[in-house]
Amino acid sequence: MKMNNRYFAALLGGTMLLTTSCSDLDTNPSGSTMGDGQLNEVLSQDPSKLKSEVSGMYANMIEYGAIIQWAGSTRHFDFGYASTMLMMDASGQDEPSQVSGYNWYNQPLRFVDRTANSQPTYFIWNQCYKNIKVANDVLKSVDLENLSDVAKSYVGQAYAMRAFEYFTLIQLYQFTYKGHEDAAGVPLVTEKTTEAEANNN
């Protein structure tokens, strides 16, 4: 009987330990992790810290494996803006290509990558809008009326990167001008666009 009591006590104690929760785990991260609000506060106080955000835009241009999570594995074209340039070259009408086992950019060459669920399309769309978001975050984090010279440099780079990414998108996804003179290009997201507007864009 004493042995059963010991097992019962051990089982009861184990159950109590496993079913109690730690309130320490319910806190927001602090220390090495910053939320958007904290980041904006730091950037507004010291605009030189914008350098890390702006550097992130350039790092996105050479990011390898950007769509691994979406695609399920790496893709041969998933190595940054250089790959986008190759796809744009392959999409031109002056690029002859024979079908071979090594034909990496055969989708753009055959114009079959123009669908919403195409991996090359997702790659380009994701790459461009990721940089547009970072540029918008830089622009949101500073007071555009009172900029220091350092902040002006970073804000200028953010505007330039955003314009460059829209230029890339419009070349690929805009209708031809003839017959579509009033057609919209690509969804426009700026630093002033709300989340609801972006979702309905």
Feature roles, as predicted:
Residues 97-172:
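Conserved, well-structured interaction surfaces
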Residues 172-201:
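Short coil/linker segments at helix-helix boundaries
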Residues 1-20:
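Sec-dependent bacterial lipoprotein signal peptides
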Residues 63, 69-116, 125, 191-193:
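A structural signal for short, hydrophobic/glycine-enriched beta-strand patches
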Residues 22-80, 145:
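Membrane-proximal, proline-rich intrinsically disordered regions
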Residues 63-68, 165-176:
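Secretory-pathway/luminal and periplasmic proteins that interact with or process carbohydrate-rich
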Residues 27, 41, 111-113, 188-191, ...:
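Generic structural "secondary-structure junction" signal
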